[in-house]
Amino acid sequence: MKVLSLIFVIFSVLVLFASAKDPVCDQPKAVGRCFAAFPKFYYNSSSGQCQAFIYGGCGGNENNFNTLEECNAKCA
């Protein structure tokens, strides 16, 4: 019985760590302070989805991905 309980605890911890998102994903969308128009993707933590936005080209934050696939792999 103790072994079964230990296995359950280990499994629970592994699931918890595997489902933890990168802190980058909690950053807000930041279009940057310049005036270029690069199509990018960011993770919207309110909707739980990656969404497109236009990046100005400088500034911003790390919640800024070149492709939808890259955003989903990191955050979704």
From Swiss-Prot:
One MF annotation (Gene Ontology) recorded for this entry: toxin activity
Residues covered by the BPTI/Kunitz inhibitor domain: 25-75
Key words, A-Z: Blood coagulation cascade inhibiting toxin, Disulfide bond, Hemostasis impairing toxin, Protease inhibitor, Secreted, Serine protease inhibitor, Signal, Toxin
SMART domains per record: KU
Domain of life from the UniProt record: Eukaryota
One Pfam family of this chain: Kunitz_BPTI
Name recorded for this polypeptide: Tabkunin 2
Naturally occurring in which organism (per UniProt): Tabanus yao
